[in-house]
Amino acid sequence: MNQTQFKIPLSSLRPYTVHYRNCDNQRLENCFYACDAYEARLLAMEFNRYIQEHPNSIDLIRRELIKNI
């Protein structure tokens, strides 16, 4: 199987926090570096089994601000 790979410059990635609720209604979060909120959602679904099985459990995807050091 031949996969096409895209090279995305690291400078274009931004930190996103994906908030979701589990079956006990506890609010949890995962953080990802992504180009946009949609990609952050896809990454969350790929790396978090609960979100993969319950994609509608996501209730917020927020882009975090980085202050220049």
Per-range role (PLM):
Residues 2-4, 46-69:
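Short, mixed-charge low-complexity intrinsically disordered segments
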Residues 13-17, 39-46:
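Basic/aromatic-rich interaction segments and small domains that mediate binding to polyanionic partners
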Residues 5-28:
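Short aromatic-glycine-(Arg/Gly/Cys) micro-motifs in beta-strand/loop hairpins
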Residues 1, 15, 20, 35, ...:
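A general, composition-driven signal for non-globular sequence regions
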Residues 11, 24, 38, 59-60:
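Intrinsically disordered, low-complexity regions enriched in serine, threonine, proline
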Residues 19-22, 37, 65-68:
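A general secondary-structure boundary signal
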Residues 26-39:
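A short, exposed loop/beta-hairpin motif centered on an aromatic-Gly-Thr core
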Residues 7, 21, 33, 48-51:
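Compositionally biased, low-structure terminal segments
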